[in-house]
Curated annotation (Swiss-Prot):
Residues 31-94 form the S5 DRBM domain. Pfam families: Ribosomal_S5 (PF00333), Ribosomal_S5_C (PF03719). It comes from Caulobacter vibrioides (strain NA1000 / CB15N). Belongs to the universal ribosomal protein uS5 family. With S4 and S12 plays an important role in translational accuracy. Located at the back of the 30S subunit body where it stabilizes the conformation of the head with respect to the body. Part of the 30S ribosomal subunit. Contacts proteins S4 and S8. Residues 1-28, 173-201 are annotated as: Disordered. One of its GO terms (molecular function) is rRNA binding. This is Small ribosomal subunit protein uS5.
Amino acid sequence: MARGEQQRGEGGQRRDRRDRNAPEERVDSDIVEKLVHINRVAATVKGGRRFSFAALMVVGDQKGRVGFGHGKAREVPEAIRKATEEAKKTMIRVPLRESRTLHHDGAGRWGAGKVMMRAAPPGTGVIAGGPMRAVLETLGVQDVVAKSTGSSNPYNMVRATFEALKVQSSPRQIAAKRGKKVGDILGRRADGASAPEAIEG
């Protein structure tokens, strides 16, 4: 706890505004690590039950790259280490609009978990709960409105969030794919937030 308080103090005003109930956060060089969930797992073996811990971690550079990992071990620190290593190996790049929000609205699903995300104007903040907030903040999103329905399982919510992020496309990417100019794509985004053309592409 002391370490977290020290990081908030060194991080300045921006960190002071973060939700105190947010997942535990660690900073490793340029990579931010967040422990989303940890639970104890029991396996029945000959002679009794064997207990271990499963950790779900999210890592990112807060500049458009993010990944998640799941690790299991008999001790909590080892489970976190394994999950962190896996998360760093599976990082994806997501284009961000103005380095602060999504380029267009999106939705994702994994198992019984469903998420919906909407780009938002400056000053909105990250309006999302639990696992979704961890992913979006670690990615570097500063303004977004997100909602989850269905399963509240942290793993399903994280996977659903990643599925929604994978379909994000910048105007440049869409223009290249369709053989058009960037201006043609931007001209169809008069509302500045939602881009149906982008979602379809």
